[in-house]
Amino acid sequence: MSIVRMTDLDLSGKRVLIRQDLNVPIDNGQITSEQRITASVPTIKLALEKGAAVMVTSHLGRPKEGSWTEEDSLAPVATRLAALLGVDVPLVRDWVDGVEVAPGQVVLLENCRMNVGEGKDDQTLARKYAALCDVFVMDAFGTAHRAQASTHGVIRFAPVAAGGPLLMAELDALAKALDNPAKPLLAIVAGSKVSTKLELLSNLVNKVDQLIVGGGIANTFIAAAGHHVGKSLNEPDLIPTANQIVADAKTRGAEIPLPTDVVVAKQFLPDAEASVKALDAVDADDLILDIGPQTAQRYAELIASAGTVVWNGPVGVFEFESFSHGTETLARAIASSKAFSIAGGGDTLAAVDKYDIAKDVTYISTGGGAFLEFLEGKTLPAVAALQARGQ
């Protein structure tokens, strides 16, 4: 990958602007999950250790450009960052036209989405960002799919543009999983709708050896195979698409296994009575809310023999205890597998947390939308810009 890496640069005495993803949930001024802040600390520490004058910026929420509000301010983030770094981290409110910072110091630049022109990747604004620094570091993989002034434009105009450790770790892991995977490559794609994961399914079916579908997506594939799905969430108009994806898999010698048993209920409620049924025994008033134990075991065996596992989405309504066993079985199979494993997407990360398997998954992507777009085979604007600068 032809991207200049921050880790390879001499930053001594240099002004370094780092774009991080510090978009954390804040409730009444209190940060409720600091995972992204914690993740950014090693990059900032490294820049300080290398003797740089460090400026860090990020977006937070979706503020109106050109107006400052307390609820959109990075002030709570600055306080937490200072505690984690053990140094003062002043928050600079108006920073586009110049920032005072000395080597060995770090400042946090207020929410970049407050700047007029940020969202539209305004060239004038991007040039102003670039003028602040000797080196620009893009370390926010979670926003790499957005062409904005702080994630794309500035990369074009900064004297030097580099990928930060977090971004590069993410890209290295994704390349290892998709570009040069240890075989067999197994992907788990689950979610409520085929329509939202259509590009993902269509791209992965050309790469994987096995594609396990789950959730509402699986129901559409089950219906496409001629089985009844009762009242289950599914998309009848996408049955031809599902059949095409199955045909594409077959042509390549890949497999899309379907459940042989499922867990059903009459109502979509946490305390609904759960019944395990053979796939052929689903009634007209049944809702399929999880894969059955027999299917979960079969899928777990596929995971055990995989060389690479890409996981995006829980296979059942795992928030409801009675319909969580399929997801838990697969999660534990991934955790105990020797395969290179990568997991990403909000619901997937919630399942990783619920079953406490983070330490057993090779790489956990915090990228969200960027992770999905990469899996869909799309070019991420920030990555393309960094590659162009690395030539």
Curated annotation (Swiss-Prot):
Biological or metabolic pathway of the protein: Carbohydrate degradation; glycolysis; pyruvate from D-glyceraldehyde 3-phosphate: step 2/5
Question: Record-annotated residues binding substrate?
Answer: D21, L22, N23, R36, H59, L60, G61, R62, R113, R146
Q: Name one Pfam family in it.
A: PGK
Name the Gene Ontology molecular function terms of this record.
ADP binding; ATP binding; phosphoglycerate kinase activity
Q: Which UniProt keywords apply?
A: ATP-binding, Cytoplasm, Glycolysis, Kinase, Nucleotide-binding, Transferase
State what protein this is by name: Phosphoglycerate kinase
Q: Which PROSITE patterns match?
A: PGLYCERATE_KINASE
* Domain of life the protein comes from: Bacteria
Q: Which GO terms describe its cellular component?
A: cytosol
Supply the InterPro entries for this chain.
Answer: Phosphoglycerate_kinase, Phosphoglycerate_kinase_CS, Phosphoglycerate_kinase_N, Phosphoglycerate_kinase_sf
The subcellular localization recorded is: Cytoplasm
Q: Could you tell me which PANTHER family the record lists for this protein?
A: PHOSPHOGLYCERATE KINASE, PHOSPHOGLYCERATE KINASE 1, CHLOROPLASTIC-RELATED
* Alphabetical list of SUPFAM superfamilies matching this protein: Phosphoglycerate kinase (SSF53748)
**Where is the chain membrane-spanning?**
none
Subunit structure and binding partners: Monomer.
User: What family does the database annotate?
Assistant: Belongs to the phosphoglycerate kinase family.
> E.C. number, please?
2.7.2.3
**Positions of ATP binding:** K197, E319, G345, G346, D347, T348
What chemistry does it catalyse, as a reaction equation? (2R)-3-phosphoglycerate + ATP = (2R)-3-phospho-glyceroyl phosphate + ADP
Point out the coiled-coil segments of this chain: none
The family database entries (Gene3D superfamilies) matched by this protein are listed as: Phosphoglycerate kinase, N-terminal domain (3.40.50.1260)
